[in-house]
């Protein structure tokens, strides 16, 4: 398949620049992967769509204020976007400046040069930067960092983004983009879902800035995914086994939860074992033809044209059904991307 197969026309005004006042106030488009049937509704419908015995799997990563502004010792301005923390004093980052800094370049980060750092090495498009202060990276980011809103939101970050570009159940700092399907859940909805007899479980995938990188090859089979760190702990493995045994469904909240679970499943397949805990980097790229091992339903936002995420959804619901659903969403003026509306998708189990 070609990247252009996943193109759709999106009017600029449908890109959500701000979240709705209430987390659960977004709209929800249901898609049945077998029939292709679409149902328009609101996010609170999730409470009716999940059933007792189901398992909801969330990504509990926490977005770090990963964008910093500063200058080189020579005076040139730069912007640093953390891709991942290598240790307590070293980061791997994207750097925007008039000229890429060479190894040994001294940097001053923060509006008032609060922190001194040295560019140590370049790894393809990324720069390894070490801070000289005793302060650990997370504390530095909390002092001078900005929330790394995606490029298409196209505005400076504001104080409210610190709360709203973050799930209510976040626990483990390390993401530079929010797992956006989770932004629709508030504490009250989570409690109502549990009261219904639905189990909740948490994986971790630290979303990298690479999630916004366009696919730069025409044939999707030639695309190579960026690596992201994943944790699928023992309690999730146990919860999945118990859910499947009782005939419940595994409902993944967000494409990052899908990629975490399916990474663990692929690891087990390759090793010829049953599902086991998985801790490590994943480069899993899911596109049509992929056989899902664990996930039965998916809650996800609307994704960018030609992105790896619309490919993942197409593999889940079927290509034709997915593209028809997106066409419907544009016609009905759903709000797109991180701060936009969501879908509830039942997996295609019979080929259309």
From Swiss-Prot:
Pfam families: Queuosine_synth. The keyword Cytoplasm applies. Keywords: Cytoplasm, Queuosine biosynthesis, S-adenosyl-L-methionine, Transferase. Gene3D superfamilies: QueA-like. GO terms for molecular function: S-adenosylmethionine:tRNA ribosyltransferase-isomerase activity. The keyword Cytoplasm applies. It is found in: Cytoplasm. Its EC number is 2.4.99.17. Disulfide bonds: none annotated. InterPro entries: QueA, QueA_dom1, QueA_dom2, QueA_sf. It comes from the Bacteria. GO terms for cellular component: cytoplasm. Pathway: tRNA modification; tRNA-queuosine biosynthesis. It catalyses: 7-aminomethyl-7-carbaguanosine(34) in tRNA + S-adenosyl-L-methionine = epoxyqueuosine(34) in tRNA + adenine + L-methionine + 2 H(+). SUPFAM superfamilies: QueA-like. Belongs to the QueA family. HAMAP family: QueA. Transfers and isomerizes the ribose moiety from AdoMet to the 7-aminomethyl group of 7-deazaguanine (preQ1-tRNA) to give epoxyqueuosine (oQ-tRNA). Monomer. This is S-adenosylmethionine:tRNA ribosyltransferase-isomerase. It comes from Vibrio cholerae serotype O1 (strain ATCC 39541 / Classical Ogawa 395 / O395). The lineage of its organism: Bacteria, Pseudomonadati, Pseudomonadota, Gammaproteobacteria, Vibrionales.
């Amino acid at each position: 398949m070609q990247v252009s197969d996943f193109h759709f026309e999106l009017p600029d005004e449908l890109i959500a620049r701000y979240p709705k006042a209430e987390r659960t106030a977004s709209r929800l488009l249901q898609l049945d992967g077998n029939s292709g049937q679409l149902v328009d509704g609101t996010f609170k419908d999730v409470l009716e769509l999940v059933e007792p015995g189901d398992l909801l799997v969330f990504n509990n990563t926490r977005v770090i204020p990963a964008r910093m502004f500063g200058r080189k010792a020579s005076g040139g301005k730069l912007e640093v976007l953390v891709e991942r923390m290598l240790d307590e004093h070293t980061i791997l980052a994207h750097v925007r400046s008039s000229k890429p800094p060479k190894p040994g370049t001294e940097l001053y980060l923060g509006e008032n040069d609060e922190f001194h750092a040295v560019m140590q090495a370049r790894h393809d498009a990324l720069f390894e930067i070490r801070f000289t202060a005793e302060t650990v990276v997370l504390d530095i980011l909390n002092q001078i960092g900005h929330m790394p809103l995606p490029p298409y939101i196209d505005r400076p970050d504001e104080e409210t983004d610190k709360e709203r570009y973050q799930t209510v159940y976040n626990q483990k700092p390390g993401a530079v983009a929010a797992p956006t399907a989770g932004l629709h859940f508030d504490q009250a909805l989570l409690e109502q879902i549990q009261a219904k007899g639905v189990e909740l479980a948490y994986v971790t995938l630290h979303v990298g800035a690479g999630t916004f990188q366009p696919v730069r090859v025409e044939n999707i089979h030639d695309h190579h995914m960026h690596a992201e760190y994943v944790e699928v702990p023992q309690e999730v493995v146990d919860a999945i086994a118990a859910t499947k045994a009782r005939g419940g469904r595994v409902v993944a909240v967000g494409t990052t939860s899908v990629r975490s679970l399916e990474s663990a499943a692929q690891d087990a397949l390759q090793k010829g074992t049953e599902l086991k805990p998985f801790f490590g980097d994943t480069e899993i790229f899911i596109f049509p033809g992929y056989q899902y091992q664990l996930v039965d339903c998916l809650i996800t936002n609307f994704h960018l044209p030609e992105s790896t995420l619309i490919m993942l959804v197409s593999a889940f619901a079927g290509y034709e059904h997915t593209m028809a659903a997106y066409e419907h969403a544009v016609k009905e003026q759903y709000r797109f991307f991180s701060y936009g509306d969501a879908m509830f998708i039942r997996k295609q189990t019979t080929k259309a």
